From Swiss-Prot:
Residues reported to bind ATP: 45-52
GO molecular function: ATP binding; ATP hydrolysis activity; DNA binding; DNA-directed DNA polymerase activity; metal ion binding
CDD domains: AAA, HLD_clamp_pol_III_gamma_tau
Top-rank lineage group of the source organism: Bacteria
Sequence positions that bind Zn(2+): 64, 73, 76, 79
Protein name listed in UniProt: DNA polymerase III subunit gamma
Length: 370
């Protein structure tokens, strides 16, 4: 039985299927429709946002037998071969594994020859920032004035490492992190097609953990399918990722705000006795303080229903009413500092306890919340 991982199985094959990058898709589509096709394109942004996917669709659009179009037919031999990864005129390489100038010379050795089958020869170089200085120099010579039948598509997660001489010769497109709601909608659609049951709260947690990377979210979803035996629940996600429930995070925060020493000791015991990702505790506290700050300044704003339950929303509004903004900001800064120190501390448990103690002892006015 052949199994296809979800990220590959449901990879977008047309521009219309691309999630969360509408302005880039629109710009590329207009370029293709107008026939204003640049010889070098650069896509940059965090992992899992669609750089390579868009590059492959662009390669397909440029070489479709029905003509250059933002809507390739997906039926001709060129389109099919691009999707299968064996199109003879698409040279796709990972620069991380081919950093030497000799590798670049070998790749571009036949650049002067016409395409064997397609309209253009396309060089798709992923993680291009990993190339050596000499490789960049050799690439520059070819990217300055390439033959009419050559197109370069570069992708990177680290724009700062690419020489300005390369950047100045490319059309540059920044792919933004995917919106939480768009990730939830995409995962939900995939799970419906896969006949997998789920809880919407579980998908929200997965989306938050992915930090804007759709591929990370889909990969994490696949892990949760296995953990939950085909049923993705909030409980499974929280247990797997070491995440607290919202009432537990609220309990820790109100203990700090109330300056309740007895409950602080209980918090320490709970953190010690359970298998929790310590960083998640501070991340959740930071997110909660952020929401409280927003409600404090803009009371009319609507909280995210996907992330917070009605009870939690009520608690956030109550804290915002009773608190002082400067105090909340001080708690936020202290928690943020604790998060930065977490990975350099000799013991993360000690680090989280020290951060909570620091927050507990801040010179702030207690807020009594039941």
């Amino acid at each position: 039985m052949n199994y296809h991982i979800l990220a590959k199985k449901w990879r977008p094959q047309t521009f219309n299927d691309v999630i969360g990058q509408q302005y880039i898709v629109s710009a590329i589509s207009n370029s293709l429709l107008l026939g204003r096709i640049h010889h070098a394109w650069l896509f940059f942004g965090i992992r899992g946002t669609g750089k390579t996917t868009i590059a492959r669709i662009l390669a397909k659009s440029l070489n479709c037998k029905l003509g250059i179009s933002p809507n390739p037919c997906r039926k001709c031999s060129n389109c099919v071969e691009v999707e299968q990864g064996n199109f003879i005129d698409l040279y796709e390489v990972d620069a991380a594994s081919r950093t030497k100038v000799e590798d670049m010379k070998e790749l571009l050795d036949n650049i002067r020859y016409l395409p064997s089958k397609g309209r253009f020869k396309i060089y798709l170089i992923d993680e291009v920032h990993m190339l050596s200085r000499y490789s960049f120099n050799f690439l520059l010579k070819n990217i300055e004035e390439p033959p009419q039948h050559i197109k370069f598509i570069l992708a990177t997660t680290n724009l700062e490492k690419i020489p300005d001489t390369i950047l100045s010769r490319c059309l540059q497109f920044q792919l933004k992190p995917i919106n939480l709601n768009e990730i939830v909608a995409c995962i939900s659609n995939i799970l419906h097609k896969e006949n997998i049951t789920y809880e919407i709260k579980a998908l929200s947690l997965i989306s938050q953990k992915s930090e804007g990377s759709l591929r990370d979210a889909i990969t994490l979803t696949e892990q949760m399918i296995s953990m939950g035996k085909g049923n993705i629940t909030e409980k499974i996600v929280r247990k797997t990722l070491g995440m607290l429930y919202e009432d537990q995070i609220l309990y820790i925060l109100t203990t700090l705000l109330n300056k309740d020493l007895k409950n602080l000791v209980l918090c320490f015991k709970y953190i010690s006795d359970t298998h929790i990702n310590f960083e998640n505790i501070l991340v959740e506290i930071l997110q909660l303080l952020h929401q409280i700050s927003i409600i404090k300044i803009i009371p009319s704003i609507k909280l995210n229903d996907t992330k917070y339950s009605k009870n939690m929303q009520h608690a956030i509004q109550k804290i915002a009413e009773l608190s002082n903004y400067n105090d909340i900001y001080l708690y936020y800064q202290t928690a943020l500092l604790g998060k930065k120190e977490l990975h350099i501390a000799p013991d993360q448990k000690i680090s989280i306890e020290m951060t909570l103690l620091r927050m507990f002892n801040l010179n702030t006015k207690p807020i009594y919340i039941k």
